């Protein structure tokens, strides 16, 4: 799989997260669950009165730092969730470009090879199904470490 094809997969997931018609999609449900349960995303984001470009760059740098040492499906879902949360703060006229840029950061961070070697989109869906059972507290067991790691890295970026 080429990195461009992988980026397109990520971009399509982010687009589905912005569109309410895909609420039965397990990846979209997992992303929305993380955003809903961790409204702290908004509180930890920098002052987004900054231009859209700076928002995307900040988010992208945080994404790249998230998988610096290891990658797992929890971190991938956390990156998708954080990106979707940021996209909610962006005006409609910039969303297409922002979605493309964020998907580029995620695809660079995760890597097409890692994605394929770990089962691709099918495994991502299976992971999301496994963390989205009837008991919503199971989501916490898988995503809290990944989300918190991403947020700590963001705070580190803010300090620099």
From Swiss-Prot:
The keyword Ion transport does not apply. It comes from the Viruses. GO terms for biological process: regulation of apoptotic process; symbiont-mediated suppression of host apoptosis. It comes from Saimiriine herpesvirus 2 (strain 11) (SaHV-2). Disulfide bonds: none annotated. A motif (BH1) lies at residues 64-84. PROSITE patterns: BCL2_FAMILY (PS50062), BH1 (PS01080). This is Bcl-2-like gene 16 protein. Keywords: Apoptosis, Host-virus interaction, Inhibition of host apoptosis by viral BCL2-like protein, Modulation of host cell apoptosis by virus.
């Amino acid at each position: 799989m080429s990195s461009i094809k992988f980026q397109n997969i990520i971009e399509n997931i982010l687009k589905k997260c912005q569109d309410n018609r895909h609420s039965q999609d397990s990846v979209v449900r997992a992303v929305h669950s993380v955003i809903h349960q961790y409204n702290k995303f908004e509180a930890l984001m920098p002052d987004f009165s900054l231009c859209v470009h700076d928002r995307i760059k900040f988010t992208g740098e945080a994404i790249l730092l998230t998988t610096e040492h290891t990658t797992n499906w929890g971190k991938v879902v956390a990156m998708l969730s954080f990106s979707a949360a940021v996209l909610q703060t962006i005006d409609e006229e910039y969303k297409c470009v922002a979605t493309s840029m964020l998907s580029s950061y995620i695809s660079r961070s995760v890597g097409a090879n890692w994605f394929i070697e770990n089962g691709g989109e099918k495994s991502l869906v299976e992971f999301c199904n496994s963390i989205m059972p009837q008991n919503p507290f199971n989501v916490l067991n898988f995503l809290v470490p990944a989300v918190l790691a991403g947020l700590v890295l963001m705070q580190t970026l803010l300090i620099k």
